[in-house]
Amino acid sequence: MNFPEQTPSKMPVHRYSSFIPVELTDRTWPDKKMTAAPKWSSVDLRDGNQALIDPMDTPRKLAMFKLLVAMGYKEIEVGFPSASQTDFDFVRKIIDEGLIPDDVIIQVLTQAREPLIRRTFEAVKGSKQAIIHLYNSTSTLPRRVVFGLDKEGIKKIATDAAQLCLDLVSTVPETKISFEYSPESYTG
């Protein structure tokens, strides 16, 4: 797979000085120094199941999207399309109307459940580049009470969902897909 590189941002990263390194001679990674700005990513447009009492409608999301682009963000999480029709419609709008600049990568969030993953791939179809951000609950309480699974069972949910994502890449051949995974944990 060919994963897209992020276009450098015009954000004023020169204003921030580098950290003072801590020397740990028994390790190699702490001695590495960042010489380039990290990827800047916005998650301001995701309402999904974390929506406020009054979630953003499409015109508000579009105004915010345009502002984030103008500010120089190159990765923008534009929604949780399988969690809300508003988010799905917004993602489709910015794709169908060609509102995503060539150097901006959209990101969408999805839970590790087959119908939600499939709906998410429907949402990003036709975009030039997209990041599918997959997550599943790994906390002790949901693992036991909601799923009735042990750690291996929860791990299988994640790996099966990741495999499904890989399989669905072929359904969006015009889109360069990247992946992100997050374990969701509230109670340990």
Language model segments and positions:
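N-terminal amphipathic alpha-helix/helix-capping segment at the start of soluble metabolic enzymes
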Residues: 2-47
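Active-site-adjacent beta->alpha loops and helix N-cap segments on the catalytic face
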Residues: 27, 34, 58, 82-95, ...
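N-terminal small/glycine-rich loop or linker at the start of catalytic domains
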Residues: 29-55, 133-147, 172-180
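Catalytic domains of carbohydrate-active enzymes, especially glycoside hydrolases
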Residues: 61-81
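Glycine-rich, proline-tolerant flexible connector loops at the mouths of alpha/beta enzymes
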Residues: 74-100, 104, 108-111, 136-146, ...
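Acidic (Asp/Glu)-rich catalytic clusters
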Residues: 92-101, 119-130, 163-174
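Hydrophobic or amphipathic alpha-helical targeting/insertion segments
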Residues: 114-140, 152-153
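Helix-rich catalytic cores of soluble enzyme domains
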Residues: 140-188
